[in-house]
Curated annotation (Swiss-Prot):
The gene is ARHGEF1. The RGSL domain, also known as rgRGS domain, is necessary but not sufficient for GAP activity. One of its GO terms (cellular component) is plasma membrane. Ubiquitously expressed. GO terms for molecular function: G protein-coupled receptor binding; GTPase activator activity; guanyl-nucleotide exchange factor activity; RNA binding. This is Rho guanine nucleotide exchange factor 1. Residues 365-381 have a biased composition (Acidic residues). Seems to play a role in the regulation of RhoA GTPase by guanine nucleotide-binding alpha-12 (GNA12) and alpha-13 (GNA13) subunits. Acts as a GTPase-activating protein (GAP) for GNA12 and GNA13, and as guanine nucleotide exchange factor (GEF) for RhoA GTPase. Activated G alpha 13/GNA13 stimulates the RhoGEF activity through interaction with the RGS-like domain. This GEF activity is inhibited by binding to activated GNA12. Mediates angiotensin-2-induced RhoA activation. Changing Y738F: Lowers the exchange activity. It comes from Homo sapiens.
Length: 912
């Protein structure tokens, strides 16, 4: 009977109008309760994550339960992955970095289990270099791996809810009573309940975990996703409300909330990432800031704009605007890059929806909207701002001030040109204002309060005063040209060239490179200081809360200079494309090219500094104990190896095949003159030699060293494995061959090209004296081991390959950089020079006899100066002839080997 009842009750809810037959007796009370329980569970909002994540209040109850009972990382990871999927390609690529640092990085507070293949790829490739498709695939695989944990958490919540042990059950029951009423009212009430639950969770933050850092990370992650759903978060707006994520249009949002469709999303776990424990910060204090000659004092600060500009919305900066936006879409739109070929018409207002829900918004929402539109009280002392203030519902000022007839007569390209010029001016003013905020609210107070030594503070904010001066002067020139031209700028090329070309451009490139290259170091230093010094942490939070910061954090302001440099080429390119006059167009295009060169130089400086920081981290973890204990004389000079003094060319994981039965996973560093094979052991990086035999020989000839000099290195593809390659080199007359295996064929090609290029760029100085003739390679050392002995993965080696390897080992001693230039041509020039010295009166095309008394033999003595010059030329000629003799000897030994390689074992005649 019970089985039958279960079968009858198993389908979903019965259709209206049909009354099921009751077949349960009075004695089956427990079974009846079970049926009611199953029915309640079927109607629950917590059957799957897809259902609950559309209900902010229900999701908050689930999140609180999971945060207090489980590890919340998997659930938060899935939610933030869903948020990533709602972004456009460009925004998603940037947001993936925050997702990586929050959930995938090894030091992340909320790190989740990562599939091995994804973890391997992330270890070998920087997150910012991964393509969009691969990023999407990684996120999908990570989310898929979290489904079991999330399903277990949902199951636990459902079972606890049936027993009345889940939080906020009464509030959820009251909310569910509103289902079926007016949709707008229900959604407003749902958001209100979610806000209350979120506020309560923030108040009980300290109970989530004993680790305060983790508790803050969990609360910030939850708050970020709630803002994504349209729930207002007071603490999030003040501390972590950033605009790293930016949605073009909320696909499933309500059409009657226009403000929510443009709402920016924050960087994942801003406060958590800011306070998260990181590896030891490299000591940069020895990198003293360069001291330059004092330049004239900064001009009057003009043009600080009180309106939000697109420049502040690029990259990290951003704002939440819960109220109705009054500005045209084109100035604040996150969907368009500045300087695009077809900028939006600024006169077009953004679509506005009905205002039926305006009364449901909290009272402070209007104030927040007004804060972003009007000048702030903290911005006084910046004259010239009013010239750029725009009316909230009107297009830029140049349209108003240009006569209507002139405006209507302008061609479309000219209108676009004026729009981009106006955008250049407005965003430049916003950038100047941001730099002044950095100086006035952070740099200067830090110096006065002695939070950092002055030298270290100058490394955190290098050349900040000079940058303010340069950008302010550029803004003043743009403002002046705008006023002189009556707000319709015809010629701007000379102003642009004066800023980006010549000496001024070089100075701008120097100070911007200095500032941008230190930004990673600055962020690390500030994080470390905030983590250790509560007084400094309070100072930063107080400064960030000021109106002038516009809810931006310090870590969001530091990268603004780099972001600004990326916009100049785009803006200037757009101006040039819409300029018809050839001379003016040429000037603008030249200025755009100068901007690209400056950006390229700055990017290179940033990469070099990042490489230096990475080398410092590797140096800190480098374990040289094996080298110091080794008796190998070849390794004696590397016992105190300092890789920070070298240049990092490339790095990545490879497999080192020592023998056919032994392979070692190594992290390879290609430096400017060395190739290092590092073995990871916990956090340490070992430089360890390996023997090709079970018992190393006393002379060390069977040892493969982890340090390879590149002066004589060359690469060769392994014929039987397209992912593998050989690195062959000679070291003090000893030739060795290493077999390394990459993950893909393209990686193998890249490694071979970089090693060959780096080795080819090294120059060996010519010997000061004639070296001794090289003995035959076979007479001084054992033959170079074949590919199978050095590790061929158990593959069979053909006789032809073995023969090739043997001949190749004999050829290795000859693989060294040749002398610069051609020796024969040099010797001939020396002979002609001596001829001119001995016979100065003889013309190049003449063959007559020399005159008496001109210093020729038999005609009189030579002058002392000429005698000295002739002697030097003779010595140089003698050295050149010795080098030619050495080359001839080497060639004679090389010809038989080349004959064998070509299949002819008979040596060619002509060498004795």
């Amino acid at each position: 009977m019970e089985d039958f009842a279960r079968g009858a009750a198993s389908p979903g809810p019965s259709r209206p109008g049909l009354v099921p037959v009751s077949i349960i007796g009075a004695e089956d009370e427990d079974f009846e309760n079970e049926l009611e329980t199953n029915s309640e569970e079927q109607n629950s909002q917590f059957q799957s994550l897809e259902q609950v994540k559309r209900r902010p209040a229900h999701l908050m109850a689930l999140l609180q339960h999971v945060a207090l009972q489980f590890e919340p990382g998997p659930l938060l990871c899935c939610l933030h992955a869903d948020m990533l999927g709602s972004l456009g390609p460009k925004e998603a690529k940037k947001a993936f970095l925050d997702f990586y640092h929050s959930f995938l990085e090894k030091t992340a507070v909320l790190r989740v289990p990562v599939p091995p293949n994804v973890a391997f790829e992330l270890d070998r490739t920087r997150a910012d270099l991964i393509s969009e498709d691969v990023q999407r695939r990684f996120v999908q695989e990570v989310v898929q791996s979290q489904q079991v944990a999330v399903g277990r958490q949902l199951e636990d919540f459902r079972s606890k809810r049936l027993m009345g042990m889940t939080p906020w059950e009464q509030e959820l029951a009251q909310l569910e009573a509103w289902v079926g009423r007016d949709r707008a009212s229900y959604e407003a009430r749902e958001r209100h309940v979610a806000e209350r639950l979120l506020m309560h969770l923030e108040e009980m933050q300290h109970t989530i975990s004993t680790d305060e850092e983790k508790s803050a990370a969990v609360v910030n992650a939850i708050g970020l996703y709630m803002r994504h759903l349209g729930v207002r978060t007071k603490s999030g707006d003040k501390k972590s409300g950033r605009n790293f994520f930016r949605k073009k249009v909320m696909g499933n949002r309500r059409s009657d909330e226009p403000a929510k469709t443009k709402k920016g999303l924050s960087s994942i776990l801003d406060a958590a990432r800011w306070n998260r424990g990181e590896p030891q910060v490299p000591d940069f204090r020895h990198l003293k800031a360069e001291v330059d000659a004092e330049k004239p004092g900064a001009t009057d600060r003009k043009g600080g704009v009180g309106m939000p500009s697109r420049d502040r919305n690029i990259g990290a900066p951003g704002q939440d605007t819960p109220g109705v936006s009054l500005h045209p879409l084109s100035l604040d739109s996150p969907d368009r890059e500045p300087g695009a070929d077809a900028p939006l018409e600024l006169g077009d207002s953004s679509p506005q929806g009905p205002m039926s829900l305006e009364s449901l918004a909290p009272p402070e929402s209007t104030d927040e909207g007004a804060e972003t539109e009007s000048p702030e009280p903290g911005d006084e002392g910046e004259p010239g701002r009013s010239g750029l203030e725009l009316e909230p519902e009107e297009p830029p000022g140049w349209r108003e001030l240009v006569p209507p007839d002139t405006l209507h007569s302008l061609p479309k390209s000219q209108v676009k040109r004026q729009e981009v010029i106006s955008e250049l001016l407005v965003t430049e003013a916003a950038h100047v204002r941001m730099l002044r905020v950095l100086h006035d609210l952070f740099f200067q107070p830090m110096a006065e309060c002695l939070f950092f030594p002055l030298e270290e503070l100058q490394n955190i904010f290098p050349s900040l005063d000079e940058l303010i001066e340069v950008h302010s002067l550029f803004l003043d020139r743009l403002m002046k040209r705008r006023q002189e031209s009556g707000y319709l700028i015809e010629e701007i090329g000379d102003v642009l060239l004066a800023r980006f070309d010549g000496a001024e451009g070089s100075w701008f490139q120097k100070i911007s490179s200095r500032f941008c290259s230190r930004q990673s170091f600055a962020l690390e230093q500030l994080k470390a200081k905030q983590r250790k010094d509560p007084r400094f942490c309070a100072f930063v939070q107080e400064a960030e809360s000021r109106p002038r910061c516009r809810r931006l954090q310090l870590k969001d302001m530091i990268p603004t200079e780099m972001q600004r440099l990326t916009k100049y080429p785009l803006l200037l390119q757009s101006i040039g494309q819409n300029t018809e006059e050839p001379t003016e167009r040429e000037k603008v295009e030249l200025a755009a090219e100068c901007c690209r060169e400056i950006l390229h130089h700055v990017n290179q400086a940033v990469r070099d500094m990042e490489d230096l920081l990475r080398l410092k981290d590797y140096q800190r973890r480098l374990d040289l104990s094996h080298l110091r204990q080794s008796s190998d004389p070849m390794l004696s000079e590397f016992k105190n190896l300092d890789i920070t003094k070298k240049k990092l060319v490339h790095e990545g994981p490879l497999t080192w095949r020592v023998t056919k039965d032994k392979a070692v996973e190594v992290h390879v560093l290609l430096l400017d003159d060395l190739l290092l094979l590092l073995q990871r052991q916990d956090e340490r990086l070992l430089l360890k030699s390996h023997s090709r035999t079970l018992t190393p020989t006393p002379d060390g000839k069977t040892m493969l060293r982890p340090v390879l000099r590149l002066t004589s290195a060359m690469t060769r593809e392994v014929a039987t494995d397209h992912k593998a390659f050989y690195v062959l080199f000679t070291w003090d007359q000893e030739a060795q061959i290493y077999e390394l295996v990459a993950q893909t064929v393209s990686e193998r090609k890249n490694w071979c090209a970089l090693i060959t290029e780096t080795a080819g760029s090294l120059k060996v100085p010519a010997p000061a004296s004639r070296p001794k003739p090289r003995p035959s390679p076979s007479s001084t050392r054992e033959p170079l081991l074949s590919s199978s002995e050095n590790g061929n993965g158990g593959r069979e080696t053909s006789p032809a390959d073995a023969r090739t390897e043997r001949i190749l080992s004999d050829l290795l001693p000859f693989c060294r950089p040749g002398p610069e230039g051609q020796l024969a041509a040099t010797a001939l020039r020396k002979v002609l020079s001596l001829k001119q010295l001995l016979f100065p009166a003889e013309e190049d095309n003449g063959a007559g006899p020399p005159r008496d008394g001109d210093g020729v033999p038999g005609g009189g003595p030579l002058s002392p100066a000429r005698t000295q010059e002739i002697q030097e030329n003779l010595l140089s000629l003698e050295e050149t002839m010795k080098q030619l003799e050495e080359l001839e000897e080497e060639f004679c030994r090389l010809r038989p080997l080349l004959s064998q390689l070509g299949g002819n074992s008979v040596p060619q005649p002509g060498c004795t």
